[in-house]
Amino acid sequence: MRTAQITRKTAETDISVEINLDGTGTYDNLTGVGFFDHMLDQLARHALMDMTVRCAGDLHIDDHHSVEDVGIALGQALTQAMGDKRGIRRYGECVLPMDDARVACALDLSGRPFLVWDVEMPTAKIGTFDTELVREFFQAFATHGGITLHLTQAAGVNSHHIAEAAFKATARALRDALEVDPRTADAIPSTKGSL
């Protein structure tokens, strides 16, 4: 079973993450940052990844440390749960519309982290949430998950819709990339023999 449990404790945050890559998309995420919890729920549900996240962070300062550190821990959990990546499809892509917004995600579970972020939020806030933290999450997640991750916005005027489209597109692309291909279930998806 492709599962992982990660704990990460610093002077700024105390985080636990549990994931099951072969789940049904159940989730129980409590970070103290309401909008971010909503985005994590979307990631779990649309990737069909069971996910439980707990974060106690220094929210009296701002949401930055909590959002970034959850991205770090979730990326570490993904890496652990994938193991040697035997049998996975490795690549995934999705163009996802959400009302006015359309965001494309293309990713490679290559072990070579890289983020291409071509997304612009028209507002600085979604409620009390700083929109710049969406990129911070994806940077941390890609770096610690070993993901080459490209997110490109083609349309959108509503920051909530743009952010949610980015999370959902990433989830759908992850779902495809993590799926085991029955034709190559015993093989590493690389001519190098490892990822």
UniProtKB/Swiss-Prot annotation:
Chief location category: cytoplasm
Record key words, sorted: Amino-acid biosynthesis, Cytoplasm, Histidine biosynthesis, Lyase
Protein name: Imidazoleglycerol-phosphate dehydratase
BP terms from Gene Ontology: L-histidine biosynthetic process
SUPFAM superfamilies: Ribosomal protein S5 domain 2-like
UniProt family annotation: Belongs to the imidazoleglycerol-phosphate dehydratase family.
GO terms for MF: imidazoleglycerol-phosphate dehydratase activity
One Pfam family of this chain: IGPD
